[in-house]
C-alpha cells in the first residue's frame, strides 16, 4: 500500500469497516505557601522515566473537508500520543492480526493464544478464559477479528513513514507544517542553522483549509474514541469550591457563599474535587480547559498584580488522603501538574519540576491514563505535544479518578466535553 492509498482507506473505513462512523466523522468536520498551594506537601520517591516512544494510529475521515480552526499540527508529539492506540497490551508492539474480545479489549491473535494456551480437546471440558486486561470472562468463541483496528494500524504505519521522509524533516508536508524539534539533524552546523531558524519570528499559520494538516480529521476522530465523558463529584469537593450546575466546571466560591456540610469523602484542606467516574482498567483520557489570572483580569478589567492563578489537574487514586495535609506526588496517590505564576510544574517529589521553561501553560491540558502500564501523561490539548509523563513500574493497583484543584475565583477549571 502506498501513501496515495490513504484517501481510499479512509473512505472504506467510513462506508464498510465502521458502519455509522461516516456520519459522525462528517459532524466532526463541520493552603498557600511561597512555592505555591500544591507543592508544600510533596514528599516521596521521584517518578521513573521511560524513554520508549509510544505509538500512533488514525481513524478514517474524509480528506479536504472543512476543519476546526484550532487543529493541531501533525508532528512528532501527535505521533507519540496516537501510537498508544496501536499498541498491544500484551507484547507492547504494534498490533498484528488484532482480535476483539466481548469486553471490547483488543490483542494480537498470537499474543492472546500464548496467554490462554492451547485449547483443550473437544471431548474435554474447556478451561475458562478471561480478558488479560479487565479479567472479565471471555469465551474463545467470542473472539472476532478487529478489522477496523487492523486498518488503523496500517494507516498509523504510513503516517510514521511519511514523517520520517526527508521532506517531512525539512518541515512541510502537503499544506501542514511539521515541527522539527523531534527530528533535528546530527550535531554540527546543520543543527546551528536549525536553531537560528527558530530564532527568527515566523508568521502564524493561516486559518484556511489548505493550511491545516490533511490527516487532522483522521487523528481527531481516533483520539475521540478514548476521551471519557466526565462530570465532577460534588460530594468530594472542598466546601469552598463552587461546582457548576452541569458539574463540568469548578472554581473557588466568592466570599459569603454558603458552604455545604462536611462529609467523609470531602477534602477539608486541599481545594480539590474528584471526577464522578473512576477507572480500574484500560486507557482513558480527558481534557481540562484552564484560565490564567492574566486573561481573567483582561476580561474583568481588574488589576490585581498581587494575585496569581493557582490550579492543578491530573489524577488521584481512590486511596488519596481527603483530610489534613495531602501529599501531592505519586507516593501520595496523586499524579498532577500545577499552573502557578504563569508557569507549569509537574508535582514530583521532593521538589516540583518546571515544564516548558518560560513558556506559559497551555490553556487546554489533556490527561492520558494508561492503567495497566502505570502511566499518567499530560499533553498540550491543542498541539498534543507531550508535557510530562509519570511512569510506574507496575499497574496502578486501584481505581483512579480525575483530580481538579483551584483556589482562584476568577479562574475556573472546565472539563471539555467528549464531543468537543
From Swiss-Prot:
Known pathway: Protein modification; protein ubiquitination
Name of the protein: RING finger protein 39
Domain B30.2/SPRY: 210-420
Keyword GTP-binding: no
GO biological process, any: innate immune response
Enzyme Commission number(s) from the entry: 2.3.2.27
One example GO MF annotation: ubiquitin protein ligase activity
Role this protein plays: Plays an inhibitory role in anti-RNA viral innate immunity by targeting the adapter DDX3X and promoting its 'Lys-48'-linked polyubiquitination. Alternatively, enhances the cGAS-STING pathway activation by promoting 'Lys-63'-linked ubiquitination of STING1, facilitating the STING1-TBK1 complex formation and STING1 activation.
Xref: InterPro entries: B30.2/SPRY, B30.2/SPRY_sf, Butyrophylin_SPRY, ConA-like_dom_sf, PRY, SPRY_dom, TRIM/RBCC, Znf-RING_euk
ZnF (RING-type) intervals: 88-135
Annotated gene: RNF39
